[in-house]
């Protein structure tokens, strides 16, 4: 594959880059790279830690986060092309659903680079433990669990995007190794990832020292692995297991929260209380006169108690910044960025349509969407650090909402969240609904289904309630959502409202399509984008193959074992082959 030399080169440079920040010895500048990797570099625990740090640094790159955004969000109904998008051909074609194999967003080399870094650590770390007596067996196991999880996360992104992908757990260290691997089936890769994570979950760090402020949410923990397993089991359609792992995360977060409350003692305020038994952050102030507290904690300051795993960008202009968010969602110079809110979402509340949000009192509309005019709406989430919704105004509309300044163009410090608590709670809700029988004709069947629906509904209601700034009732009405199809749509709609612009929506729609065995639901919701790309979607996305992405043309040329997704051409002429379903 084309990524062969890139993987090896990047892995080696990753070692060098990690050492640069750690003041490694000067021999790195004069020895051949292969000798560094195979001989002199891997001697003590610090060497291993440096390479692990390099894995996280690679994940922070603009190319990686850009693809997390594009693959998980840009084909969905949430977004359309923004400022000057017509000058960015590849991005523009995504929004027009005119994707071909030459589109730069189909490249995956940065993800495979991270995978190989992880495989390299797994290859060399045991020998380091033999040399360094201070590198204990438990620390070695924790390292292996950490990089295994990072590797599995990268593969999870790849299979959700491309479906079948080349899969290996072998480190590539020289050009003589075989790289032209055929694609492994989605189901086989998913099973391997689950097996791997379950084998290492208990070895991962549960709690980092409190002195390491950002480690608990900026590095892999047991909670992060359990969140990954909950989601993977959703895709596997093993819903009981998805619930089991989601509960592990929810229970762990609840214990952490209770421990924090115990430390606070009498200083506990209204805003510190759980919502319906869940340790989620209250969005309103203690008096209820303003809202935006949860948004600022989760997306502004970041590293919140709801976070499970996020890519952390330090609030320091001398450190790396989140260039992907700055470019795509916007900054102090250009807002909206090259991606903006879909028109039907932007007008949903102002025009009182409520196809997406349940009412104008859902604070997530005001926190996610910023109106620049009656026809132009920017993505506020991640681009801005805080939102203040003033409930003392006579009426809740745009003049009751104020926004802090956007991040500076070259200094966006917004963390990119991969897993947070409400995401996992909604995974559980989805799994509970899917556990219900499709045949509830008997009284026993109806009762069993009703129990599952009510459990799922309670989760959704708690999440919805925290974002409801109405002075009246904040409760959803269960009587409107007590069938399986109604509950399925409620879960997916709540995931859209809660996780909007976080790189989740397209994957949610693909997962729904895999479960349904067709793309009817996906096409129906994505077509809501209308003239901004939706009208051409019905025919292009009518076949299941088309909801994935094509392999990049360069990969096909150099790896003869890769067979192109049948929905896509070579990329040199058309985007889609003119074939039937």
Feature locations, PLM:
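Flexible, polar/acidic helix-loop-strand segments at domain edges
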Residues: 347-421, 427
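Conserved, well-structured interaction surfaces
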Residues: 49-63, 84-162, 184-188, 197-210, ...
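An aromatic- and glycine-enriched ligand-binding surface/loop that stacks and positions planar moieties
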Residues: 25-88, 165, 190, 196-204, ...
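Bacterial Sec-dependent N-terminal signal peptides
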Residues: 1-33, 441
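Long, intrinsically disordered, low-complexity segments
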Residues: 23-27, 56, 68, 80-85, ...
């Amino acid at each position: 594959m084309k990524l062969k030399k890139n993987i090896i080169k990047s892995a080696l440079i990753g070692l060098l880059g990690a050492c640069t920040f750690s003041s490694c010895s000067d021999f790195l500048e004069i020895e051949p790279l292969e000798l560094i990797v195979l001989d002199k570099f891997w001697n003590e625990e610090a060497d291993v830690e440096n390479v692990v740090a390099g894995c996280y640094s690679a994940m922070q790159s603009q190319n990686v986060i850009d693809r997390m955004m594009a693959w998980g969000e840009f084909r969905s109904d949430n977004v359309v092309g923004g400022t000057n998008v017509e000058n960015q051909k590849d991005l523009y074609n995504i929004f027009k659903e005119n994707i071909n194999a030459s589109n730069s967003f189909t490249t995956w080399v940065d993800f495979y680079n991270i995978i190989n870094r992880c495989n390299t650590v797994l290859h060399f770390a045991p020998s380091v433990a033999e040399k360094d007596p201070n590198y204990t067996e438990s620390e070695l196991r924790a390292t292996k669990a950490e990089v295994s999880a990072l590797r599995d996360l990268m593969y999870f992104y790849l299979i959700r995007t491309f479906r079948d992908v080349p899969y290996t757990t072998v480190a590539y260290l020289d050009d003589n190794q075989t790289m032209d691997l055929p694609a492994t089936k989605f189901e086989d890769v998913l099973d391997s990832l689950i097996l791997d994570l379950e084998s290492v979950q208990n070895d991962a760090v549960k709690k980092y020292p409190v002195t390491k402020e950002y480690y608990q949410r900026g590095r892999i923990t047991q909670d992060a692995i359990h969140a990954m397993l909950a989601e993977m089991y959703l895709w596997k359609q093993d819903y009981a297991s998805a619930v089991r792992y989601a509960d592990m995360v929810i229970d762990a977060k609840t214990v952490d929260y209770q421990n924090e409350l115990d430390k606070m003692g009498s200083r506990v305020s209204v805003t510190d209380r759980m919502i319906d038994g869940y340790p989620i952050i209250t969005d309103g102030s203690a008096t209820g006169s303003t809202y935006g507290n949860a948004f600022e904690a989760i997306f502004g300051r970041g590293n919140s108690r709801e976070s499970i795993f996020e890519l952390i960008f330090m609030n320091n202009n001398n450190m790396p910044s989140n260039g992907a968010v700055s470019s795509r969602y916007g900054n102090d110079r250009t807002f909206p960025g090259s991606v903006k809110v879909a028109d039907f979402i932007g007008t949903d509340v102002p025009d009182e349509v409520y196809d997406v949000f349940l009412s104008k009192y859902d604070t997530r509309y005001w926190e996610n969407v910023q109106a620049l005019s009656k026809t132009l709406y920017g993505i506020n989430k991640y681009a801005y650090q805080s939102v203040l919704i003033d409930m003392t105004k006579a009426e809740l509309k745009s003049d009751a909402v104020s926004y802090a300044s956007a991040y500076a163009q070259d200094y966006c410090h917004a963390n990119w969240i991969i897993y947070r608590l409400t995401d996992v709670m909604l995974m559980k809700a989805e799994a509970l609904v899917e556990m219900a029988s499709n045949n509830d004709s008997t009284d026993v069947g109806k009762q069993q289904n009703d129990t599952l629906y009510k459990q799922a509904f309670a989760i959704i209601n708690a999440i919805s309630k925290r974002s409801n700034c109405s002075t009246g009732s904040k409760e959803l009405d269960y009587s409107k959502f007590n069938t399986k199809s109604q509950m399925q749509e409620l879960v997916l709609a709540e995931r859209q409202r809660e996780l909007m612009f976080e790189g989740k929506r397209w994957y949610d729609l693909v997962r729904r399509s895999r479960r349904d065995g067709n793309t009817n639901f996906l096409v129906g919701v994505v077509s809501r984008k209308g003239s901004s790309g939706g009208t051409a979607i019905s025919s292009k996305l009518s076949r299941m193959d088309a909801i994935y992405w094509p392999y990049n043309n360069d990969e096909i040329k150099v790896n003869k074992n890769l067979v192109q997704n049948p929905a896509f051409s070579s990329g040199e002429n058309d985007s889609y082959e003119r074939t039937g379903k």
